[in-house]
Swiss-Prot record:
The lineage of its organism: Eukaryota, Viridiplantae, Streptophyta, Embryophyta, Tracheophyta. Its cofactor is Mn(2+). It comes from the Eukaryota. GO terms for molecular function: ATP binding; protein serine kinase activity; protein serine/threonine kinase activity. Belongs to the protein kinase superfamily. CAMK Ser/Thr protein kinase family. SNF1 subfamily. Signal peptide: none annotated. This is CBL-interacting serine/threonine-protein kinase 25. ATP binds at L49, G50, K51, G52, T53, F54, G55, K56, V57, K72.
Length: 488
C-alpha cells in the first residue's frame, strides 16, 4: 500500500504562518509606543497584527493587569447590511459564556455606532500544524491533541454551537503544549494580510469540509465538525491530507466517495476510528459520545476537564473613537441557541467562499478562476451577456465553454478571452478565465477594468488569480513581463 500512496504537501506557506496573529510574537516596546492607543480606557491597543475584509486585528494589553490580548475589530455596517445583527448578538451571547481550557477565550465584546470589538485570548505557542509540516506526529502525541480537540468541540456542541470551519489555521498550541481551538463563536476573517504584506485567503479548503457541506444542502453543522475532526486526526498521524489532488474535480469526487488510503504505519485501532469519522452519510457518521468510548481514544486520557461558565456582559459604547474618555453602558443579553443559522454560517455567508488557489497552480500565467453558487447555465448566460455588453463577438465552442473576441485588431492581433464552466457539485461551480489570443497588456486592461467588475454579481470567491503576479499597474499603465500570445 505504501508504494501507491501519493504524498502531497500538508500545507502551503500561507497556511503554516497563519494571518490571524493572535499567537505571533508580541511586538517590541518600540513598536508598541509607535502605535499605542487606548481603547475604552481599558485596553492599550498596539500594532496592527492582521487585516481582512471585515476588519482588523490588533495586539493589545489590559491596562489594569498587563495581560496580552488580541483585539479584533469588525465593521458593523457590513453586519447590518446582511440583516444579521441580532443573530450574531445571540451567538456571541452563547460564546461569551464558554470557558474551556481548549478553546481560545472570547473575553469581552464591545461596540460603538460603527464597530464591534472582540477581545480575544492571545495565544503564544503557534500553530499545531507548524509542528508537523515536516512530518507526522507520534501516535501518543496525536492522540493527546485529538482528545483535546474532541473535548472542545463536544463542549460547544452541547451548547448548540458548531464550528463549521475546523482546519489547521484554527488549531493553536499554548506555551504549555495544550491545544487551543480558535474562532468558536467567531468565524475566521476570510481574507487577511500576513507580515509579508501579501493577501492570503483563509476560508476552509474543501480538503477539510464534509461532503454534505460542499453540496450546499441543508446539513447538521455538528456532524460536519466531526468529519473535519477525522481529517485533522488523519493529518496528525500521516503528515499529509487524505483527500488531495492537483485536479479540483478529482478531489471533489474523492471527498464525495470518501476515497482515500491509509499509510502503512497507521495502527489498526486508529484506522478503525478514522473509517468511522470519514463516512459520507452524516447520519451514519460516528457521534462524539461514541468517539469517546473507542479504545484508541480512551488510551492515556486525562481526568475529565473542569470548566466554568461566567455571567455575560456586553458593552455598548456610544463613542465612535476609542479614547480614554469613552463612556460605557452595560446591557445583558439572554443567550439563545439558533437552531439552523448561527454566527459561523453568518460570517460564512458574507465570506468569499473556499480558498482553492493552491489547487490551481499552472504554468499558464494569464488565467483566473472563481467559484460560484449560480448554476452552470446561468453562468454561461451571464458570460455571454457580458461579452455583448462589451461589444465583443461571442462564440460558444462547447455547452459550457465560450470565447469572447475583440472586434478590433490590437497590438498583437485580435484579443480573445476563453471562459469554461465546471459544475463540481450541486450549487457549486468553478469558472476558469484565460487569454487565448492577443496582447498581454491589452488583455490585462480588459480583464481588470471590464471583465472582472462585470462578474462580481456571480462570484463566490476568486482563486488562483495568477495573472496579477506578473502584471503591475504603474502610473496608470499596465506593465508585464509576458511576451506570449496565448496562455490557454
Amino acid at each position: 500500500m505504501g508504494s501507491k500512496l501519493k504524498l502531497y504537501p500538508l500545507l502551503n506557506h500561507s497556511s503554516v504562518f497563519h494571518p490571524d496573529s493572535r499567537y505571533q510574537s508580541a511586538p517590541t516596546m518600540e513598536e508598541e509606543q509607535q502605535q499605542l492607543r487606548v481603547l475604552f480606557a481599558k485596553y492599550e491597543m498596539g500594532r496592527l497584527l492582521g487585516k481582512g475584509t471585515f476588519g482588523k486585528v490588533y495586539y493589545g494589553k489590559e491596562i489594569t493587569t498587563g495581560e496580552s490580548v488580541a483585539i479584533k475589530i469588525i465593521n458593523k455596517d457590513q453586519v447590518k447590511r446582511e440583516g444579521m445583527m441580532e443573530q450574531i448578538k445571540r451567538e456571541i451571547s452563547i460564546m461569551r459564556l464558554v470557558r474551556h481550557p481548549n478553546i481560545v477565550e472570547l473575553k469581552e465584546v464591545m461596540a460603538t455606532k460603527t464597530k464591534i470589538f472582540f477581545i480575544m485570548e492571545y495565544v503564544k505557542g503557534g500553530e499545531l500544524f507548524s509542528k508537523i509540516v515536516k512530518g507526522k506526529l507520534k501516535e501518543d502525541s496525536a492522540r493527546k491533541y485529538f482528545q483535546q480537540l474532541i473535548s472542545a468541540v463536544d463542549f460547544c456542541h452541547s451548547r448548540g454551537v458548531s464550528h463549521r470551519d475546523l482546519k489547521p489555521e484554527n488549531l493553536l498550541v499554548d506555551e504549555n503544549g495544550d491545544l487551543k481551538v480558535s474562532d468558536f463563536g467567531l468565524s475566521a476573517l476570510p481574507e487577511q494580510i500576513l507580515q509579508d504584506g501579501l493577501l492570503h485567503t483563509q476560508c476552509g479548503t474543501p480538503a477539510y469540509v464534509a461532503p454534505e457541506v460542499l453540496r450546499k444542502k441543508g446539513y447538521d453543522g455538528a456532524k460536519g465538525d466531526i468529519w473535519s475532526c477525522g481529517i485533522i486526526l488523519y493529518v496528525l498521524l500521516a503528515g499529509f491530507l487524505p483527500f488531495q489532488d492537483e485536479n479540483l474535480m478529482k478531489m471533489y469526487r474523492k471527498i464525495f466517495k470518501s476515497e482515500f488510503e491509509y499509510p502503512p504505519w497507521f495502527s489498526p485501532e486508529s484506522k478503525r476510528l478514522i473509517s468511522k469519522l470519514l463516512v459520507v452519510d452524516p447520519n451514519k457518521r460516528i457521534s462524539i459520545p461514541a468517539i469517546m468510548r473507542t479504545p484508541w481514544f480512551r488510551k492515556n486520557i486525562n481526568s475529565p476537564i473542569e470548566f466554568k461558565i461566567d455571567e455575560l456582559e456586553i458593552q455598548n459604547v456610544e463613542d465612535e473613537t476609542p479614547t480614554t474618555t469613552a463612556t460605557t453602558a452595560t446591557t445583558t443579553t439572554t443567550p439563545v441557541s439558533p437552531k439552523f443559522f448561527n454566527a459561523f454560517e453568518f460570517i460564512s455567508s458574507m465570506s468569499s467562499g473556499f480558498d482553492l488557489s493552491s489547487l490551481f497552480e499552472s504554468k499558464r500565467k494569464l488565467r483566473s478562476m472563481f467559484t460560484s453558487r449560480w448554476s452552470a447555465s446561468e453562468i454561461m448566460g451571464k458570460l455571454e451577456g457580458i461579452g455583448k455588453e462589451m461589444n465583443m463577438k461571442v462564440k460558444r465552442t462547447k455547452d459550457f465553454k465560450v470565447k469572447l473576441f475583440g472586434k478590433t485588431e490590437g497590438r498583437k492581433g485580435q484579443i480573445a478571452v476563453t471562459a469554461e464552466v465546471f459544475e463540481v457539485a450541486p450549487e457549486v461551480a468553478v469558472v476558469e478565465l484565460c487569454k487565448s489570443a492577443g496582447d498581454t497588456l491589452e488583455y490585462n486592461r480588459l480583464y481588470e477594468e471590464h471583465v472582472r467588475p462585470a462578474l462580481e454579481e456571480i462570484v463566490w470567491s476568486w482563486h488562483g488569480d495568477n495573472h496579477n503576479n506578473n502584471i503591475v499597474k504603474s502610473n496608470g499603465n499596465y506593465v508585464s513581463d509576458e511576451n506570449s500570445g496565448s496562455d490557454c
